[in-house]
Amino acid sequence: MSSSERLIYMSQPGVSIDWQYQAAEYYCQAIRGLKSAINTPAFDADPADHTSQSSVVSAAIAILSTYDLMDAPSMGWKPHLSALPLFSPASNPMAIPCSPVAVPQSIVEGPVFWSLARLDFLCASISETQTRLNLDDIPLWRNAGLAADENGVLLPFSPTGSGDIRASTGIQEDTRSNELIWLLGKIVNYLTSGDAINPEEFALPPGERFPLGVPQEQLLERWKILDTELQKWYDSLPTTFQASARTRRHDVASANADLNGFEQIWYELPICAATMQSYHMACVLLLVNKPQESTAIRTTLSARFRYYRQVQHQVLWHAREICGISLASPPDPVRVHSVLPLYVAGQVFHEPHEQRVVLVLLSAIETELGWATRYHVKKLTDEWQEEEHPLRSRLNVN
């Protein structure tokens, strides 16, 4: 039966359709089509040509990876992006090459590259591994549009040759959002490398790691560099990244009472809302992972606890900002990008009413959009239960 005949048959009244089966079948057909396309002689004929088969296949991989991740509830994230263009398995021995399609290295630019870079960051965050794309390969990132010098320092953005402020504004938003993806990749690589001299060694079991690590002072210097880069990025943002309005909910219904303590934070452009959620997530990750000064440097207990309270206050504020953006009824693409920031915010909250708000927001994404969040919901609820009964958990008492 041809595709057109199948569509006619499926549209007839009374025909019961298993949409999950249909989706899986078309996904398998797409994978077979990719394999066939890659094996053709013209695949790498002109990788710099955006209309070439290589660019089309790269775009298809980005789309299929996103489709695959929509219903990957747990560590199924880990192997999906082994087919990333510009990813060489030899450069990352910790990678798991179990993708159904192996794509040769090629030049990928523009939106396709940044879509792949975002997926790479998400996969690294969930699986707690290093990114597959080399963030230190500055020519690669500059070729994709990153405004940075040869040392990887972000440059002030200046639109080229456009007198239309609306056009230049759109370029700025995209550019700033892409820059944050690059910074987030650097942050997750910092976190997943631990104090290992070779970042990949930290992923090994404790008994197999090299016994010597990076000194605490050096880890702190790396942290300060990342913190400074993130602050410079934030300070350079155009005014469109500022919230256009802040409102408070006043629901009298008991079911919505948990939301009353949160602001609704509105942005004129959806890309700004999504980017700022990722920014607040980056701040939380950096704040809670700041290395301590050397224990040889004496400080009072009061000063140390005062610092802890300041960090707790700051991360709570960033977590509430993440939720406030999600509570302002953003469009569906923003909600999809909010899954990881909401998950991080949920790890920050310890008050039950705040935790319930995160669960409501995450569950609604899966219910209304079909993007799997049940893995994040289960992880959060398990962590909260352990926090609620820490002594029982440690003693394994029912």
Task: Give the location of each predicted region.
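Cytosolic regulatory protein-protein interaction regions
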Residues: M10-V15, P156-P333, A345-R356
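Eukaryote-specific, cytoplasm-facing alpha-helical/coiled-coil scaffolding segments in long proteins
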Residues: L86-P93, L140-N151, A203-L212, S254-L259, ...
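Surface-exposed intrinsically disordered loops and tails
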Residues: S2-I8
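Intrinsically disordered, low-complexity acidic/Ser/Thr-rich segments used as protein-protein interaction/activation
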Residues: Y9-W182, F210-V214, Q218, R249-P270
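Residue position in alpha-helical solenoids
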Residues: G33, T40, F87-A90, W233-S236, ...
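Intrinsically disordered, low-complexity regulatory regions with latent secondary structure
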Residues: K232, T247-R248, W266, V348-N398
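Alpha-solenoid helical repeat scaffolds
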Residues: S3, Y67-M70, L119, I126, ...
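Amphipathic alpha-helical/coiled-coil segments positioned at domain termini
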Residues: H337-P341
